[in-house]
Each structure stands twice: as C-alpha cells, then as structure tokens.
C-alpha cells in the first residue's frame, strides 16, 4: 500500500509540472510586447479634479501692498488686465472657481494657455507619458518572454520540491 501511495504522489507531481510548463505564468500583452511605446518629450499641464464631496470651491489670493489694507479709508486697485506697471503689483487679486466637473474658470489677467479641462481630457488627470522628459517602456512590455521563462523555472522547482516532500512524507506514513 505504501508503494501505491508513492506512485500516486509521483503521478500528481508529474502532472503538476507538466501543467505549469505548458501554460505561461503570465499572459504577455501582445500589443505592447510587439510595439513598445514611442519616446515623447511633450509637456502637458492638467488641472486637478475637484473634490467629489464639494459642489464648488472658490480660492482667492491677494498679493502686493494692498493686502494689508489702506489706513485712510480709500482703496486703490491696480489694473486687472494682465499688464504690469512699475508701481502696481501683478494682479493684486486673482480669483479662480473650481466646479464639481473639474473645469477652471479663470479671471481676467490669468494665463490660461496651459490649462486643460479634466472633462475633455481622456484618461487619468496625469496620463503616462505626459510628464516632462522621455518615457521608456516597462521591462514587462518589451521583454515578457524573460519573465515567463524565469517564472516557469520557479514553478518547476517548486513542483519538484513539493513532490519530494510528499513522497518522503508518504513513505513514513
């Protein structure tokens, strides 16, 4: 009876090794494995998404000597058209409103050339490759066969070790 137990355990170990060698450990992504991502140096700036719990957020920043307030009861306001004079600070007051959809509403004098609305941008707010610099493909994208070979060897080693332990255990039972 012990001899038959050893044969059954050996057959299970052989079946486990064969099944693991036949199927790859991970399925390679054929689209990225055959065509690595192209390098890019495009700089894209996106606005952050509004908090899900708030309907709108308003932020006001004040700069310049007017921030402390006038002492004689009068207030002077520099032009808010984006121009700068020698005596007036840059846009003493700038207000930006952020709605729940993530769109930014700039005021006059605010540079909006690099703002992108989250509602029109596809994907996450900072997609891969949109950062400054050169993007490189992941190691798993360009060479998945090396990962599969290593993982397959690891599974084979583990199956042999498991079969050995089971065989020795069955012998002493």
Swiss-Prot record:
Residues 22-89, 134-155 have a biased composition (Low complexity). Germinating spores. Residues 95-133 have a biased composition (Polar residues). Keywords: Sporulation. It comes from Bremia lactucae. GO terms for biological process: sporulation resulting in formation of a cellular spore. This is HAM34 protein. The keyword Ribonucleoprotein does not apply. Could be a structural protein required for the infection process of B.lactucae. Signal peptide: none annotated. The gene is HAM34. Residues 22-155 are annotated as: Disordered.
